[in-house]
């Protein structure tokens, strides 16, 4: 994760610190994805949970504004296929399958299967 992305999300946090209702649900989901990556040190910008389909537009818009070019989706919910279609409807494209690496709770490298999405 580069400094542009960190600065964007940190500014988002600071600007909404006293009133999270200023942010849309999709923007909050994007911020929580950023937080997940800070806490898990994934090898790629990992998205372990996509937003509700109704919030996908704001989620993608926020990620693009932050400078995120690709996400590695590790979500395994039953809504995954529908979410992939919603991402495609936002102009995103599936680059293919990938494997992300992040430390487990003991600090050992753990591989997780993912789908790499280009946010275009």
Locate the predicted segments by residue.
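C-terminal edge-of-domain segments
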Residues: 91-120
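N-terminal leader/targeting segments
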Residues: 1-82
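Short, aromatic/basic amphipathic alpha-helical patches
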Residues: 80-93
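Functionally constrained cores in energy, signaling, and assembly domains
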Residues: 34, 88, 113
């Amino acid at each position: 994760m580069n400094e542009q992305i960190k600065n964007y999300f940190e500014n988002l946090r600071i600007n909404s610190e006293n009133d999270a209702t200023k942010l849309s649900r999709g923007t909050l989901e994007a911020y929580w994805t950023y937080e997940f990556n800070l806490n898990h040190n994934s090898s790629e910008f990992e998205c372990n949970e996509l937003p509700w389909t109704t919030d996908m537009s704001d989620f993608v818009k926020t990620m693009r504004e932050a400078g995120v070019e690709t996400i590695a989706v590790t979500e395994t919910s039953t809504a995954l296929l529908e979410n992939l279609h919603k991402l495609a409807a936002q102009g995103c494209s599936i680059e293919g399958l990938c494997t992300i690496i992040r430390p487990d709770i003991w600090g050992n490298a753990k591989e997780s299967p993912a789908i790499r999405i280009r946010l275009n």
